[in-house]
């Protein structure tokens, strides 16, 4: 992938990522993961900006292999979230029905890197093919060459040293659905009244 294409793909993923995080906050985390072969298996990590110190949120494709969670930085060392977790590996993790503190370790030199990376790419659904990589068809050597810049990371759950922050969290904006429903009912009631009691609006 050339630099121009990579920049466009990164920009597209940035917009998708924002929408994905909002879906989790709207309580749709389970639905986001309902089609693993298409949209992939997705979790969200909360990480600390290496310069700003602010909390950032990034959805990631992941695979569970031998009881461990693995993800990859497809844009290598240029990924902002990767540079953030390299500087501060402690992260907050959102999974369907779960929320906990964890630590991210880079394991790019793992002896089974290709097997683990292939599992993550298969679990990414359309994302890997969109980047020009078909993990189901490529052999080990071809996959290693195509992903030479990829970083492989492992996420481990740890006991939280401090309480998880109340916001943001999965489902913290689920009340939006009630607001939308109330707005819809109000609009429907006004429309019905205009149709059946037009004199009220004259």
Describe each model-derived feature in a short phrase.
Residues 45-46, 89-97:
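Short conserved beta-strand and strand-loop elements enriched in small hydrophobics
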Residues 22-51, 176-184:
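N-terminal first-folded block
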